């Protein structure tokens, strides 16, 4: 209760007010009829968006009020709103490392853990921003200018750099919200997004904290203890066979789920084409990228993330049950 009233509620109110000022709707009105610049009629959804978006980000939930998530101009209207939402995703997971050091009265340990997490995050940001700002070489070959970088699947009001930053921010946590299409990012960018979720330790999320990172600490302490010939200890407790068995199972379970799921999907795609066709065909991009789409889907589900390579037609019986 205290975490809700002292942390989540105040932060949600602050972020909500900022989003309202930036243009996010807040009310209980139904669809609004508007006339577009082309002269056609369109119905635009409204509702309590500014109340839902803050807790979606602060709680590392990621489920958007609108179907296209934070790509929608009413959910993420401006560049400043985009920055605030990025901050909202990271603030509590980042604070977990400091809270760990504070409550155990070992602040240096908390700082070192935070430093490792931050380093991994910044490496991912640098790679993705440089990849997306550099543009698509295939489009360069056509002689088409890419002054704003690789803009496929991205919002003009945000640009390629902000979308690349968000893609790393949402995958180093268990958030999963998006402000652009991850399936349209450059190959190395997509790899970094997948790698973040496969490691599944950077920052974590609200509810589980950095539980997976703690597992790797236990394994590292045990191995280092064996290397120097002393009994491994962490936080004053011996790390013995029982702890190692639990940590090993937890560490191996994540890749096991991902690989088994991907292998099953790939097998069905090749050996049961009639079943795949009955579900709409699954892949819009067969080949290497199609395999990446299936791998990303199971990686995202196993990491409790929720983002996806949306070239995959995953709203089917098979994908809903296997991912669930």
What kind of feature is each model-predicted range?
Residues 1-324:
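Membrane-proximal intracellular helices of multi-pass ion channels
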